[in-house]
Amino acid sequence: SYKHAQRRWSLEENLELKYEYLSTFDRFMVYFAQNHDILKKSEFIQDLFIDDTRKLIVFKKQDLIFIFNFHPTDSYSDLCFPTKDSNSYKAIFDSDLDIFGGYNRVSRDIVYHSINNLKFNENCITIYSPSRTCIVLEKL
């Protein structure tokens, strides 16, 4: 019915609920996408690593690497994935920030260096990926 299909903007203001975090995340994602021209650029998306069992997706667009961990409980302390280059990267966004209702489990101060990995036989980055998060790395 119409009664249940309408938007309820007042939910964001109820601090007992978590909608304020969702609203903050939504505003930041729009800001992030606009500042990095993610949707305007016609560059293709390059799949770097997909693991259905561990529920991980890593892809690259422009100079950004997106790491999605969709697993509801498993965090990966030594997630290693190929980068197809030998650059260094730094985290510029992660969905685990406390302003989004997260736990601040990802350090923003670490520089990740792409080094040769024998498992993949190419340059890789090793990173901590908490459960139910997205991390975006930018090439330095």
Describe every region a protein language model picked out.
Residues 1-140:
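Carbohydrate-interacting/catalytic domains
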